[in-house]
Amino acid sequence: MEKKKNIWVGKIVVIVLIIVSIGSYYVFPSVKHVMNQVFKMFASGDFAVVRDFVASYGAYAALISFLLMIFQSIAAPLPAFLITFANANLFGWWQGAILSWSSAMAGAAVCFFIARILGRDVAEKLTSKAGMQQIDTFFKKYGKNTVLICRLLPFISFDIVSYAAGLTSMSFISFFVATGVGQLPATIVYSYVGGMLTGGAKFLVTGLLILFALSALIFMGRKIYMDRQNKKAK
């Protein structure tokens, strides 16, 4: 009974926050202007645009970056690596890595609890039905390892994985630990690259993305092979 009550309270709080956020967008011109800037910034695909936007807030730049990372997590699949590059370029690679990692963890937690509290319908509206079904297949095949595997695949929105994990029986602690471990290597590499990134470094970024994809495919291939061997042994 107490658990059901807590779930309903959680639903009410989340729904109120969503209503207030949407209402603010339409009622306050300044909020609408900033939000339109944010969407345009992500749509540009240019980390320099993101960097300049964050830097424009001066002493509050780190806070704005933190909130941006949470926002892009909720509004999947906006590209998180743009923020990671911008953070490293603005604050230095290791300081940027800490900021990007911690804010991504916060964003993942928010997505997880949105799905757990509000359910599948809301999660699919914030992402896509096809995307959620794709991740469902991963969870059926690899279980809790899905969080680690998908973190290695740069072409899969990890935010969708966070939503999908919230719909499973996976505990938050297990999800949070797997998320922290899984995203750390990519965050460090992206931050290191972002710290020295210029407009002419697109080929380097592309090469890194391909490297991550190949690493993930090798990992998945090994996992599938081991699963088949275990089945044969049984």
Model-found features: residue ranges?
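Membrane-interfacial helix-loop-helix
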Residues: E2-G10, S21-S65, M105-I160, L167-T168, ...
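Hydrophobic alpha-helical membrane segments of integral membrane proteins
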Residues: K11, A55, A59-S102, T137-L197
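Core hydrophobic alpha-helical transmembrane segments of single-pass membrane proteins
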Residues: V14-V20, L211-A216
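Residue-level recognition of pore/gate-forming positions within transmembrane alpha-helices
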Residues: M69, A104, A108, Q183, ...
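Pore-lining and gate-forming transmembrane alpha-helices of multi-pass membrane transport proteins
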Residues: T179, G194-G195, F203-L211
